[in-house]
From Swiss-Prot:
Record GO biological process: nuclear-transcribed mRNA catabolic process, nonsense-mediated decay; regulation of translational initiation
Binding partners and assembly: Interacts with NCBP1/CBP80; the interaction is direct. Associates with the eukaryotic translation initiation factor 3 (eIF-3) complex.
One Pfam family hit: MIF4G
Compositionally biased residues, Polar residues: 52-62
Ranges of residues in domain MIF4G: 378-579
Annotated Basic and acidic residues bias: 139-152, 258-272, 321-339
UniProt-recorded name of the protein: CBP80/20-dependent translation initiation factor
Function statement: Specifically required for the pioneer round of mRNA translation mediated by the cap-binding complex (CBC), that takes place during or right after mRNA export via the nuclear pore complex (NPC). Acts via its interaction with the NCBP1/CBP80 component of the CBC complex and recruits the 40S small subunit of the ribosome via eIF3. In contrast, it is not involved in steady state translation, that takes place when the CBC complex is replaced by cytoplasmic cap-binding protein eIF4E.
Stretch list, region Interaction with NCBP1/CBP80: 1-305
Gene3D superfamilies assigned to the protein according to its UniProt record, in alphabetical order: 1.25.40.180
Residue(s) carrying Phosphoserine: S18, S299
GO cellular component: perinuclear region of cytoplasm
Lineage, uppermost ranks: Eukaryota, Metazoa, Chordata, Craniata, Vertebrata
Organism of provenance: Mus musculus (Mouse)
Length: 600
C-alpha cells in the first residue's frame, strides 16, 4: 500500500512539473516570437531609411557632378557666355572682348566671324559637338549585400563600374586627334614604301645610283636619257633616285611617258633634301642640269638660253661625255616652249614682286553711289593705289576724311564696301587696304564697328566662294588675297591675330592647289600668300600646314604640272624648310630669274 501510494504521488508531482515546464516553454516561445517579429520590423524600417538616404545622397552627388562636368566642358570647348557680346545685335562685337567664332563652326549661339572664344576650338570645323550623356545611377541594395540575399542583377559588377560611377567626358580623344594620328600613320607607311622601293633587288650597290652602262637591262631603259645620256654619274655627284612613288601617286607605271621622268623626279628629290646648297650652284640659271631639278630633261623647257650667259660646266668623263651631252641637248633646244598665260592681275603682282611695277599703267575706276560724300575718299584711295610711297600719311588723311564725312551706319557701311570692293577687284591694292582696315578697326558709328562690317563681308564671300570661282576667277583670287592680307595685318586689342580666319584661309589655300581652271594663277596666289602669312598660319594650326605642304609636294612632283608651278611650289617648300625666314640673296635671285624666263 505504501509503495503504491508513493508511486502515485511521485507520478502526480512529475506530471505537474511537466505541465509547468510546457507552460514555461510556451510562454518563452511566445515572447521570443514577439521579439523576433518586432526585430524584423525594426530592421526593415531602418533599412528602408538608409536606402532612401543613400539614394538621395547619390542623386545629389550625381547632380553636382553633372553641373561641374557641364560647366567645365562648356568652357573647355572654348565658348564664353553670351553676355560677353556687347554689340546691339549679338552678332557684331569684337574689340571689347576679342571673342570670335565663325558660323561655319557648330557653335551654340550661331555667331558670325565677329565673335571669338578665348580659346577657339578649331576641331569644330571638322566635327559636331558631343553632349555629355546623363545616365542615372542604379540603386544599391545594401541590406541584400550585407546579408547574402543578393539576387542576379542587383549588385555592382566591376566590369560595369562605369555604369555606377559618373563618367568624365573631358579626356576622351577628339576626332581631330584621330585624324592626325591617321595622317601620321599614312606618312610612316609612305616612308616605308619609299625605302622598300629604293632597295635594289640584289643588294645596295653603288652602280644603281652611279654609272648606267649601255648594256644594262630595264634599269638602263628607264635612265637611258638621264643627265649625261647614260655615260656617267650625275653632274652634281648626287644620286638620281627620287623619294616618291609615281606608280602609286599618278599610275604612270606603263612606261608610256618619256623616259626622263625618273630623272626628273630624282632631281626634285635632291631639291627637297638639299636646301642649304652652295651659293654658286644656286646662282646658276634654270638651264643648268646640275641644279635642284626645277626643269627635267624631258621637258621642252629643260635648256633655256642660260648657256649663253655663262660657260657650260665641265662634265665628268672627259670631252666625249661633253660631246654626248651636247648631242642629246641640241634637239631639245629646237622645241618650242609651251606658252604660259597668266591673268593681268597675276602679272601685276609678279611685276611688283620683281620691282618692275609700272604705277601708271592701271586705271582705277571711281564709281560712287554718293558722289557728294565719297568723291574725296575715292580720290585718296586712287592716289594710294597708283602711288605706294608715303602710304601712312595718305592713310591718316583718309581716316580723317572718313570720320568727318561719316554720320550714320549706312555711310560707314558704304565706306567699308568701297574699300572691300577695291581690294578684291585689285589684288595689288590688297595689302594697302588691309593696313587701312587695321587703322580704322576701332572706328564706330551708332554702335556698329568698322571691323564688324568688314568681317561680315569676308564671311559672306567665303560662303559663296565656289560660285565666285565659277563666275569670276579674278574676284575669287582677289578675295583670297585680301582675306590673307587681313589675317596677316589686322590685330585684336590684345595684339593677337584673328584666329577665326585660320581655318577659312587653309581651306582657300587648299582649293587653290586643287584648282584646274587657272592652275598657274592659283598656284601663284597660294605661293605669295604662304610667303607672307605662312609662319603665322603654322603657329596657329601646324597640323593643317603639314597637310597643305604635303599636297604642295605632290603637285610639284606631278609630271603634268608646268615649270612655273614647280618653281613657285619649290620656293615655298624651301622657305618652309628655312623656318619661314627670308632666303639668301643668291637663292632669291635664282627664283626671280627663273620666274622671269618662264613668264617672258
Amino acid at each position: 500500500m505504501e509503495n503504491s501510494s508513493a508511486a502515485s504521488a511521485s507520478s502526480e508531482a512529475g506530471s505537474s512539473r511537466s505541465q509547468e515546464i510546457e507552460e514555461l516553454e510556451r510562454f518563452i516561445d511566445s515572447y521570443v516570437l514577439e521579439y523576433q517579429v518586432q526585430g524584423l520590423l525594426t530592421d526593415k524600417t531602418e533599412g528602408d531609411g538608409e536606402s532612401q538616404r543613400t539614394q538621395s545622397h547619390i542623386s545629389q552627388w550625381t547632380a553636382d557632378c553633372r553641373e561641374q562636368l557641364d560647366g567645365s566642358c562648356s568652357f573647355s570647348r572654348g565658348r564664353a557666355p553670351p553676355q560677353q557680346n556687347g554689340n546691339k545685335d549679338n552678332s557684331l562685337d569684337m574689340l571689347g572682348t576679342d571673342i570670335w567664332a565663325a558660323n561655319t563652326f557648330d557653335s551654340f549661339s550661331g555667331a558670325t566671324w565677329d565673335l571669338q572664344p578665348e580659346k577657339l576650338d578649331f576641331t569644330q570645323f571638322h566635327r559636331k559637338v558631343r553632349h555629355t550623356p546623363k545616365q542615372p545611377l542604379p540603386h544599391i541594395d545594401r541590406e541584400g549585400c550585407g546579408k547574402g540575399k543578393l539576387e542576379d542583377g542587383d549588385g555592382i559588377s566591376l566590369n560595369d563600374i562605369e555604369k555606377v560611377l559618373p563618367t568624365w567626358q573631358g579626356y576622351h580623344p577628339m576626332p581631330h586627334e584621330a585624324e592626325i594620328a591617321h595622317t601620321k600613320k599614312l606618312f610612316r607607311r609612305r616612308r616605308n614604301d619609299r625605302r622598300r622601293q629604293q632597295r635594289p633587288p640584289g643588294g645596295n650597290k653603288p652602280q644603281q645610283h652611279g654609272d648606267h652602262q649601255p648594256g644594262s637591262a630595264k634599269h638602263n631603259r628607264d635612265h637611258q636619257k638621264s643627265y649625261q645620256g647614260g655615260s656617267g654619274p650625275h653632274p652634281s655627284g648626287r644620286p638620281t633616285h627620287h623619294g616618291y612613288s609615281q606608280n602609286r601617286r599618278w599610275h604612270h607605271g606603263n612606261m608610256k611617258h618619256p623616259p626622263g621622268d625618273k630623272g626628273e623626279a630624282g632631281s626634285h628629290r635632291n631639291a627637297k633634301e638639299t636646301v642649304t646648297v652652295e651659293n654658286p650652284k644656286l646662282e646658276d640659271g634654270p638651264g643648268d642640269t646640275g641644279h635642284s631639278g626645277l626643269e627635267p630633261p624631258c621637258s621642252p623647257d629643260t635648256l633655256t638660253p642660260a648657256a649663253s650667259e655663262r660657260p657650260t660646266p665641265q662634265l665628268p668623263g672627259g670631252p666625249e661625255a661633253e660631246i654626248k651631252h651636247k648631242d642629246t641637248v641640241l634637239p631639245e633646244r629646237l622645241r618650242e616652249r609651251p606658252k604660259i598665260t597668266l591673268l593681268q592681275s597675276s602679272k601685276d603682282r609678279l611685276r611688283r614682286r620683281l620691282k618692275e611695277k609700272d604705277r601708271d599703267e592701271v586705271a582705277v575706276e571711281t564709281s560712287s553711289p554718293q558722289p557728294s560724300k565719297m568723291d574725296r575718299l575715292m580720290e585718296i584711295l586712287n592716289i594710294m593705289r597708283n602711288n605706294s610711297s608715303d602710304v601712312d600719311a595718305k592713310l591718316t588723311s583718309f581716316m580723317e576724311e572718313a570720320q568727318n564725312s561719316t554720320n550714320s551706319e549706312e555711310m560707314l557701311g558704304e565706306i567699308v564696301r568701297t574699300i572691300y570692293q577695291k581690294a578684291v577687284s585689285d589684288r595689288s591694292f590688297a595689302f594697302t587696304a588691309a593696313k587701312l582696315c587695321d587703322k580704322m578697326a576701332l572706328f564706330m558709328v551708332e554702335g556698329t564697328k568698322f571691323r564688324s562690317l568688314l568681317l561680315n563681308m569676308l564671311q559672306k564671300d567665303f560662303t559663296v566662294r565656289e560660285e565666285l570661282q565659277q563666275q569670276d576667277v579674278e574676284r575669287w583670287l582677289g578675295f583670297i588675297t585680301f582675306l590673307c592680307e587681313v589675317f596677316g595685318t589686322m590685330r585684336s586689342s590684345t595684339g593677337e591675330p584673328f584666329r577665326v580666319l585660320v581655318c577659312p584661309i587653309y581651306t582657300c589655300l587648299r582649293e587653290l592647289l586643287q584648282s584646274q581652271d587657272v592652275k598657274e594663277d592659283a598656284v601663284l596666289c597660294c605661293s605669295m600668300e604662304l610667303q607672307s602669312t605662312g609662319r603665322l598660319l603654322e603657329e596657329q594650326l601646324p597640323e593643317m600646314m603639314t597637310e597643305l605642304l604635303a599636297s604642295a609636294r605632290d603637285k610639284m612632283l606631278c609630271p603634268s604640272e608646268s615649270m612655273l608651278t614647280r618653281s613657285l611650289l619649290l620656293e615655298v617648300i624651301e622657305l618652309h624648310a628655312n623656318s619661314w625666314n627670308p632666303l639668301t640673296p643668291p637663292i632669291t635671285q635664282y627664283y626671280n630669274r627663273t620666274i622671269q624666263k618662264l613668264t617672258a
